[in-house]
Amino acid sequence: MDMQQETIERIIRQVLGQVGPAGGSIATLSGDAGVDPFQVAVGVSNRHIHLSRTDMDTLFGPGAELQRKKAMKQPGQFAAEETVTLKGPKGSLSKVRVLGPLRRETQVEVSVADGFALGITPPLRQSGQLDDTPGLTIIGPQGSVTKDHGVIVAQRHIHMHPSTAAKLGLRNGDEVDVEAGGERGGVMHRVLIRVAEASADEMHIDVEEANALCLKNDDVVRICKK
């Protein structure tokens, strides 16, 4: 097979959504990431922050509103134009993206390596589980705020629509294994299933996990039920 023909066939497979794990580029609201119903597209999360209304006012000025930069696959969620600096006991991280919409409580999501750089040890947690977590100082253009908790390393998880969960025999809170193909492929254990009506089927991992398996946004992995 010559190079041109091979390229054409690869493009056709991608368009049809039939590329194997870690080889596709598929985004869907229905969960059909290909012929195999257990396939799901990957979203890679870099460090970011979710802000409360009170902290938004302190950092960006009273009544400030987030400016949309880019829509995310989860309905209603977006990356904002606004960024902040995170300052810990040891160091700081600049240009940390704010994600919208605003939340009830401020939550910072970083990698393990980010924790080393900041001088804190954030635990591996589900989103929203902020008890007994470290804090830091958040610096914005109009002010700063020091939090006594709220920093986590996010547990890898799969957002899933109820119709997909029913089809796969999964429930909210289940944990599954997920297989990634490719030269640096492997199996990720204890991947949390998060089922909600306002969800698009997508697996969320952080940059460290993505780098370890050579995964990027929209690559396709496969759910392996325990």
Curated annotation (Swiss-Prot):
Binding site for CoA: 44-46, 72, 90, 97, 116, 211
Binding-site residues for Zn(2+) 2, renumbered to this chain: 157, 159, 204
Pathway annotation from the record: Polyol metabolism; 1,2-propanediol degradation
UniProt keyword annotation of Transferase present: yes
Protein task: Involved in 1,2-propanediol (1,2-PD) utilization within the bacterial microcompartment (BMC) dedicated to 1,2-PD degradation by catalyzing the conversion of propanoyl-CoA to propanoyl-phosphate. CoA is regenerated within the pdu BMC (for use by PduP) via this enzyme, although there must also be cofactor transport across the BMC. Directly targeted to the BMC. Phosphate is probably the first substrate to bind in the forward direction. CoA is probably the first substrate to bind in the reverse direction, and might bind to the enzyme as the BMC assembles, ensuring cofactor encapsulation.
InterPro entries listed in its UniProt record: Asp_de-COase-like_dom_sf (IPR009010), PTAC (IPR008300)
Binding locations of Zn(2+) 1: 48, 50, 109
Protein name: Phosphate propanoyltransferase
Subcellular location(s) per record: Bacterial microcompartment
Protein family according to the UniProt entry: Belongs to the PduL family.
Assembly: Full-length protein forms large oligomers. Homodimer, when purified in the absence of the encapsulation peptide (EP, residues 1-47). The EP may influence oligomerization.
Cofactor mode of binding and number, as noted: There are 2 Zn(2+) ions per monomer; Zn(2+) and CoA bind inbetween the 2 domains in each monomer.
Pfam family for this entry, one: PTAC
Gene: pduL
GO aspect biological process, one term: propanediol catabolic process
Domain free text: Formed by 2 beta-barrels, each is capped on both ends by short alpha-helices.
Binding residues annotated for phosphate, in chain numbering: 103
Cofactors: Zn(2+)
Top-level taxon of origin: Bacteria
EC number in record: 2.3.1.222
Organism: Rhodopseudomonas palustris (strain BisB18)
MF terms (GO), sorted A to Z: acyltransferase activity, transferring groups other than amino-acyl groups; identical protein binding; metal ion binding
GO cellular component, one term: bacterial microcompartment
Keywords: Acyltransferase, Bacterial microcompartment, Metal-binding, Transferase, Zinc
Chief location of this protein within or outside the cell: other
Enzyme class: transferase
Catalyses which reaction(s): propanoyl-CoA + phosphate = propanoyl phosphate + CoA
